[in-house]
Every structure is written in C-alpha cells, then in structure tokens.
Amino acid sequence: MTGRRSDRPLIWRLTRATLPAAVGAAAVALLRRRRRPAPEAVPEAIPVTPSYAGGSGTPLVLLHGVGGTWRVWRPVLPLLERRHAVFAPTLPGHCGAERLAAGVAPSIHALADGVAEQLDRAGIDRAHIVGNSLGGWIALELARRGRARSVVLFGPAGAWRSAARMTAVATGMRLSFVLLATQAGRAEAIARRRWTRRLLLATQVEHPDRVDPAEFAASIRAMGDSPVVAPLLRVITKNPLEHLPADPDRPIRVVWADRDRVIPFERNGLPLLERVPGAELVRLAGVGHVPMSDDPEQVARLILEVTRTADRAHEKDRGASSMTPGAQPRGAS
C-alpha cells in the first residue's frame, strides 16, 4: 500500500502531462464518426511562406513556439509595425523554413544557429527579440550571443523543477503533434468546426473562438511538414537552459499567463527566473500559453514598453558617446 500511494502522484502527473495527445486523439476520433456537415464555411487555404517582414523603425524579431510558424504572431503585427521593422521567421525545420543541414541533430543550439543565420541574411545584427514558448528559449540563446537589444518572453520553455514531468509533457506534445500531422490533408475540414477548434486549442489558448479558422487550418497543415519537431521533442529535456548573466544594457521581461496549461508558472516559470537573474516578471491574466490571439493589445503593449525604454536608453548612450572625443557609439542596428 505504501508503494502504491507514493506512485500515485507520479502517475497523476504523467496522465495530466500527456493530456494533449489524448485530447487530440478524441477530437480526431469524434470527427471521423460525425457524418453531418458542419454549418460553418470551409476556410480558404493560406499559402506557406518562410518569414514575414514589415513596418519601420528599430528591428524587432518574433520567434514562435514548437510546431508553429511565424503566422502565430499575425494578431499583433499591425500594432508592432507602427514602431518597428518587424521580422518574423519560421524556425528551421518547421513548415516553410529551411531544414537543418544534413548531419545536424535537432537541438536548441542548432535552431538558434539557424535563426542567427536567418537574421544575418536579413541584415539584422542586434534586435529586440520576442519569443513564445520554444521561441522564448531560442531568444535567450540569441541574447547569450549578443544579438539582443532587449528580450520579451511569453511563457518561455527551457526550465523545470521535475525532469520526469517535463519529459512527460514533451512526450504528450510529440504524440499530439504526430497525430494531428496525419490529419494535415483534412486541416480545413477540421478547422471549420467550432467544437474541434475548442477541443484542440484548449491547452494552447484561453479563447479558442478568437483564433481565425483559416489560421488554425494552416497550423494543422504545418504540422504535416515540420520534420524537426518530433525528434526535437524526444531530446529537448536533456539539456535545460543554462544560466544567463544579467546585463543592464539588455533588459529582459518574462510574461507568464495565469492560464498557461502547457508549462505552468510554478513548475516552469520560477526555475526559469532563477536562470535569468535580473529579469522582470509580469503575470498576464485571462490568457493562455499562446496569448497573441487571446489579447493582442496587451501582448503588444508589454512588448512595446520594453522596446521603447531600450531604444531611448540606446539613443541616450549614443548621444553621450558622440560628445566624448574619440568615443565609439555603443551597439549596432
């Protein structure tokens, strides 16, 4: 009896961690059994592109989460482009982006290398970098390499209290991803049904009805053409985020949703803050793990507050340097 009681918490944690895969399987099974056509129109297929660039101002880079594409940032793009030259690439090995080079094993460092190359090709040296989930982890690795003017993270991956639980979470995500990838050819049919959108998006967002059906269909199709995801999720928990020294010239804001059902703050946010000393924490109410569609205005505001402050400090430093004989301006565009 004693052994059974001690096992029960672990079993419960593993069950909850693999819930996304179970939800995905249930949705697909129910969809196959339903015969009546849904009343909603089939969303038009969205063409695949490797990146997005628009707006003007200081450079701002947006990095999405595992299995996604740059399109997850669409709700906030108009709000950010008023102040910044926005560059949103799809991560290497994801739908529409370049694959990892032959012989390169999937890892956080390999993805960070690929994103750094994307920035080089786009002519971006240092930029404000914003990341969600996996994109947040990559943003921190780019900051470690000196590529960040500032960093804003929404539910960043990379740290955890329990390696066993995080491995179970990654396994659940991988199984869910593999399952939905088999349905890529039916993406539009799945996305047009409100009940499947609500079921499949329940762990990702707080307000599934705010997600455009066409965008949801595009995300399902992307899963069928993202070869890096499954092997990455097999190994992602082997090397957690390393300690990132504080830098007063590179502000970091960590935003954590109060409804994050993928990587909750208590289990993942607190250990991440221990690895990123000096980071500012903001708790965001009423949104899920991917908050851009839940509350685009709040997300944009939390980004622009940081970039505006960093840009002003940068300009002040440049002005002070220009008044000092022989001094060189700090930073680069």
Regions found by a protein language model. Give the residues of each.
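Alpha/beta-hydrolase fold catalytic core
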Residues: 1-60, 81-85, 106, 124-125, ...
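Catalytic histidine-centered segment of alpha/beta-hydrolase-like enzymes
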Residues: 287-300
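Conserved loop-alpha-helix segment in the C-terminal half of the alpha/beta-hydrolase fold
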Residues: 249-287
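Conserved HGGG/HGGXW glycine-rich cap/lid loop of the alpha/beta-hydrolase fold
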Residues: 52-99
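Flexible "cap/lid" loop of the alpha/beta hydrolase fold
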Residues: 148-183
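Gly/Ala-rich beta-loop-alpha elbow adjacent to hydrolase catalytic centers
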Residues: 131, 135, 139
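Conserved alpha/beta-hydrolase catalytic His-Asp/Glu region
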Residues: 187-247
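Conserved acidic catalytic loop of the alpha/beta-hydrolase fold
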Residues: 109-127
